[in-house]
Amino acid sequence: AYIDTHTAKTERQSVLVSLDRDGRVLRVDVTVFFEPAQYMAPQDFLRQYDGAVLHEELVIRRGIRPIAGASFTGRAVNNAVRRVLALDQVLQSTALSDVQ
């Protein structure tokens, strides 16, 4: 699991991105959110990432439905999930090359 802290619109938020052994998203949870509550990503938005892997369709308005009225939050969460998936790929490939 990874925690990504970033700015949503003007304030910080942290998301916990849990991955399985194969690098697929198990779940995404918001752990800290300092923006107004109405801009927080709802659970049905976050559940879209369940089972996701890093690919070109993992973006808002392609493979991910946007959040009405909270586009900054949606983009920030999407960017965080993509960062975590990319970081995990790098760390996993580094770990595999260290074993060989």
Which residues are covered by each model-predicted region?
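Flexible, solvent-exposed loop/hinge segments and secondary-structure transition points
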Residues: 1-75, 79-100
